[in-house]
């Protein structure tokens, strides 16, 4: 039996080390460009280079290596980015890391395939693929917007105004392009030097050398690279000019005053004593806010701020302590002049299925729908995968039971994008991470909403980075649709956002607090281009990349077959 004593060349070892360096660099760039434990607002400027090391890594790797590196990149990047999921449950972080282990392995394989089947300008196809990937990863049951590159620019108010025209995925084109431009510029210059050096050192006739030199110059031409770079520069400048023009505009001459309450309570504490203490705290904070301003039109409490179902315990409840707590709350609301928007674990009694639970927002107005409680109700439609919803509980009962053992709350899904109309303000109430989805909020605006009142509870994360990541996405919902947002959260970030995405008031995180802010009343006729056309920028990128990949693959197969046939 022969032993393989083949030694690893120093150049091979250096190549492996460099690939690992590129892998870690790309993960760190992704992590630091978003809100993180070191920079709570994120270093958004780094996002313009996020994909540069990835493209070089793919270029230098064989296909199977690219798949492996993609898997490691996905798990590592989202492990760093979403470390706070471990505070909820280690299984949550594991699921996300495994999910992106698979997703990024597929992404890298497609990017490598694009590199293989294109001879000159594969970087341009890779650019479209990346933009398409960032849209596709937000779709479906597992889809989420966390980690979309353009969200890193949430503090860059002038630049993000372009989202009112094409949404966050249009901005993605602008932020991602510098990575592929620099990759093309550097790699083509290196390749040009290598090819010309080979021609000069080769023992060829002058005619053969001339032909090879011309081919080398053609294959490494930077003409298209510079044309695309110039076009990007023009679009970037135009986006800033557009941002400057719209930032100074006054959106409305009518306002309502809103008090958003932050109770700083943990979602893990249960029991009637805890519920009573929390409701009393919310009432106290509300009274403090109202003592500072007699003009408050709306009071907003966070997601599931009132844990016992208000309507169920009033109409059907058998627990006297819960009934008394609900009665105390309703009496307080009925004696108050403000409209109350309250997060509640709403329950309904159904004949066939028994009691059904929803994560809901209830809207009360004194003298109209408080006694008996008949509030306007919106129930969360986009539920968090695995922690609020698991559609395959009958297919995978063991795994479903494991999830339930993790002390999570499974909710029924709502079915109506409700728009409330109180005191001249038409608003919708996206709950928790619903305001991270452009499709959800756009649907609400199309239904007539002119303000988002978001109820959230991210206190379980014990992380400022988590709450800033959430806020960053909420900012874009206002810009895309040209409407203000009010966020009432358990621990942060409770704030008021104007239609241009500027956070005009915010409460400190992880403390009991409230903010009082004026919210513009937007006219019904005002609707942004994005609201009308939706995420067409993402759809085009996904569709175009798939089409080009298919066509180019067919061309390569036919060419290879013809070369064999005529050989």
Each predicted region: which residue ranges?
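Short, conserved active-site loops that position catalytic residues or coordinate cofactors/metal ions
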Residues: 38-53, 262-263, 295-315, 449, ...
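Short beta-strand scaffold segments in enzyme catalytic cores
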Residues: 359-363, 418, 492-497, 515-517
């Amino acid at each position: 039996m022969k032993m393989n004593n083949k030694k690893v060349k120093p150049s091979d070892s250096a190549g492996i080390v460099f690939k690992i360096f590129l892998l870690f660099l790309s993960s760190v760039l992704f992590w630091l460009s978003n809100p993180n434990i070191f920079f709570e607002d994120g270093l958004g400027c780094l996002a313009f280079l996020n994909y540069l090391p990835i493209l070089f890594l793919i270029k230098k790797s064989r296909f199977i290596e690219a798949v492996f590196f993609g898997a490691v990149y996905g798990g590592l990047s989202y492990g760093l980015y979403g470390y706070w999921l471990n505070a909820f449950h280690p299984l949550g972080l594991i699921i996300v890391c495994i999910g992106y282990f698979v997703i990024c392995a597929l992404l890298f394989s497609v990017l490598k395939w694009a590199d293989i089947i294109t001879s000159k300008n594969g970087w341009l196809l890779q650019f479209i693929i990346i933009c398409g990937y960032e849209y596709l990863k937000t779709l479906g049951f597992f889809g989420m917007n966390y980690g979309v590159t353009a969200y890193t620019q949430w503090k860059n108010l002038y630049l993000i105004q372009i989202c009112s025209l094409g949404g966050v995925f249009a901005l993605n084109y602008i932020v991602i392009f510098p990575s592929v431009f620099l990759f093309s510029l550097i790699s083509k210059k290196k390749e040009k030097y290598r090819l010309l050096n080979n021609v000069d050192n080769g023992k060829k006739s002058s005619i053969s050398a001339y032909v090879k030199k011309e081919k080398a110059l053609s294959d490494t031409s930077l003409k298209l690279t510079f044309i695309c770079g110039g076009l990007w520069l023009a679009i970037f400048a135009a986006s800033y000019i557009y941002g400057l023009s719209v930032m100074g505009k006054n959106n409305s001459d009518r306002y309502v005053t809103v008090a958003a309450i932050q109770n700083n309570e943990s979602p893990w504490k249960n029991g009637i004593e805890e519920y009573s203490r929390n409701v009393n705290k919310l009432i106290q904070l509300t009274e403090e806010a109202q003592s500072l301003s007699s003009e408050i039109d709306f009071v907003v409490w966070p997601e599931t701020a009132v844990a016992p179902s208000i309507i169920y315990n009033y109409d059907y409840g058998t627990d006297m302590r819960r009934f008394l707590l609900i009665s105390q709350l309703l009496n307080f609301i009925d004696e108050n002049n403000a409209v109350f928007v309250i997060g509640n674990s709403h329950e309904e009694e159904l004949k066939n299925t028994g009691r059904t639970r929803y994560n809901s927002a209830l809207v009360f107005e004194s003298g109209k729908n408080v006694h008996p409680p008949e509030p306007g109700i919106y129930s969360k439609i986009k539920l968090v995968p695995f922690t609020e919803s698991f559609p395959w509980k009958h297919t995978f009962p063991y795994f479903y039971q494991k999830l339930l053992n993790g002390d999570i709350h499974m909710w029924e899904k709502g079915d109506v994008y409700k728009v409330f109309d109180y005191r001249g303000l038409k608003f919708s109430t996206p709950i928790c991470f619903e305001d991270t989805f452009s499709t959800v909020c756009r649907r609400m605006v199309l239904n007539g909403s002119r303000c988002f009142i978001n109820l959230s509870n991210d206190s379980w994360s014990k992380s400022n980075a988590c709450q800033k990541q959430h806020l960053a996405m909420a900012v874009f919902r206002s810009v895309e649709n040209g409407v203000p947002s009010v966020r009432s959260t358990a621990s942060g970030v409770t704030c008021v956002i104007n239609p241009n995405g500027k956070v005009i008031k915010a409460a400190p995180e992880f403390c009991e607090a409230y903010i009082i802010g004026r919210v513009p009343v937007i006219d019904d006729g005002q609707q942004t281009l994005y609201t009308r056309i939706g995420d067409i920028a993402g759809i085009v990128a996904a569709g175009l990349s798939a089409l080009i990949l298919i066509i180019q693959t067919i061309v390569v197969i036919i060419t290879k077959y013809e070369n064999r046939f005529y050989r």
